[in-house]
Amino acid sequence: MHSDTNGRTKSNNSPSDNNPNETVILIDSDKEEDASIREANLPVRLYPDRRVGRRRDALNRFVRSDSRSRNSQRTHITASSERPDFQANNDDITIIREVGRFFGDDGPIDPSAHYVDLDQEPGSETLETPRTIQVDNTNGYLNDNGNNNESDDGLTIVEERTTRPRVTLNLPGGERLEVTATTTDIPIRRSFEFQEDLGASRRQLLRRSATRARNLFVDRSDENDEDWTDDTHNLPEAIQRARRESRMRMSRRIAERQRRVQQQRVSSDENISTSIRLQSIRERIQSYTPDIRSAFHRAESLHEFRSILQNVAPITLQECEEELMALFTEFRNQLLQNWAIDRVRNTQEEALRLHREALERQERTAGRVFHRGTLRESITNYLNFNGEDGFLSRLWSGPALSDADEERHTQNIIDMIQEREERERDVVMKNLMNKTRAQQEEFEARAASLPEGYSASFDTTPKMKLDITKNGKEETIIVTDDDLAKTLEDIPVCCLCGAELGVGIPDDFTGISQKDRGVSFEGLVSKYKFHCPYQTLARPSMLDRDLSKRTFIASCGHAFCGRCFARIDNAKKKSKMPKKKLAQLKGSAHPDNYGPKLCPADSCKKLIRSRGRLKEVYF
């Protein structure tokens, strides 16, 4: 038997008494009746629904246009008669198998549901039947009262096999999460696989969204439970391994960062405390008053340092201006150099760390795993792009610095610091020269008019003065005396004792000679033409010889040896003795003779005992 277009059953008048058990009835659904039902159930929409007319698969998902399945889904029912009966309209039907596909290509649409087109899923023709029901009418509520009405037939469900619908979600970083959900619970699709053109803020927002989606199914507080531990097997092994490596790298990076910060503090303290040069500078700073010491640390420039000293210690600034300015410049330069060394060290450590991470990233990339996406992107690319490693790799695209590059980089920083120090020093010197130009011109004029026997130069060649007329004006010039240069030599000596500057007391001098032993001190002064000649020493010590080799210049321009400088400084204390004891001192033992208050040079009355009047010079 078969059904006509209206679904009514008719007999084909074929004999069935040969094999009555093989009578089969094939029932097809009525398309017109199904269409009327669908039209009655269609929702009323105020705007056209663009989803109407698109084909769907068995799970009511939109099917791609290139899908091979183009046949409508329909229900097939296979039935056979339980016992032979020659009356076609009185047959008893046994349904032994039913295959139901509940959604057609143009079936009804739930407007409140959202759908996801998962590229990872195979075609609809390979899907397993979501539900299988087998029924039998031989037992249960079967009507055996002889009534031939088909509406009185009953069905007994003897077996039901259902498949729990599972949905696979694509998460950021190439990860997947398989959850149990119905077709109406599938979330809307996200563009996780195309993040290369997104900004950092957008990627962070997507990661947060994925975290919230994960928390919907697994609570954070239950991460240590057995259910959470057992559920991790749903993730691929490559993703689990990448997660473990990422957590280990992050923990190592945090520990290394903390250790580096601690080392920086310790090394910075050690550099400041152990630097010999900086320690000596600090000792020199400690010799000043607290106000001046605080100015060294508070001032950030030389001009600010000068302004602070003018307010707190104007007298000290006037007396020791050059020394304070040089000390401040040296102190700031040393601090800046220590800072540069620390910064270079930190840069080297950071470069080594980035180089090590780049090597690890290359090793991971060598064994990358591809997922089944449309573009077959690498999971390693997702992890490197979304994680901190990918961000650092974009910042540090090139290889790490080598040892030679690090040394050159360090030397460039040091050269830059030195150049800036030289520029600052030149500016300071230029300002000082402009302020003291009038005094310098005065000194040059006095140096050009020195009396006979005095010179403003350490040149030993004899000079002579000549008067010439130039442009109608008379001028005096100094030229070399060639005749005297053959037989004589000018030697710069100390104005107080007569020792040669830079050479000191001669090595062959062992003490006062026999000829000078009986001569008075005044006689020796008139003989050697010096205020307190070194020939009056009874026996020079090694300290006297060493000190006499040093050279000091007074503010008036006259030179003294280091031995006389020490004796002048000692004369300050000696001059405070009682007058009776002071009157008992004679000759070279009297402080006014070996350490006078005024400069002993001819026609010079400048003070030399006060502090800062004598300054050492070096050749």
Curated annotation (Swiss-Prot):
Tell me the first and last residues of the signal peptide. none
Where the protein is mainly located, per its record?
Answer: nucleus
Subcellular locations according to the entry: Nucleus; Chromosome; Chromosome, Centromere, Kinetochore; Chromosome, Centromere
Any idea which residues bear Phosphoserine here?
Answer: 14, 29
**Per the record, where are the segments of Low complexity compositional bias?**
11-21
Stretches of the chain forming a coiled coil according to its record: none
Region labeled EUC1 interaction domain — which residues? Answer: 201-335
Q: What UniProt keywords are attached to this protein's entry?
A: Centromere, Chromosome, DNA damage, DNA repair, Kinetochore, Nucleus, Phosphoprotein, Repressor, Transcription, Transcription regulation, Transferase, Ubl conjugation pathway
> Region Disordered: start and end of each range?
1-23, 63-90
Q: What class of enzyme is it?
A: transferase
Enzyme nomenclature, EC number: 2.3.2.27
Catalytic reaction list: S-ubiquitinyl-[E2 ubiquitin-conjugating enzyme]-L-cysteine + [acceptor protein]-L-lysine = [E2 ubiquitin-conjugating enzyme]-L-cysteine + N(6)-ubiquitinyl-[acceptor protein]-L-lysine
Any one GO MF term held by the record is: transferase activity
**This protein's domain notes:** The region between Ser-201 and Leu-335 is required recruitment of SLX5 to ub-hotspots via interaction with EUC1.
- Report the protein name in the record: E3 ubiquitin-protein ligase complex SLX5-SLX8 subunit SLX5
From which source organism is this entry?
Answer: Saccharomyces cerevisiae (strain ATCC 204508 / S288c)
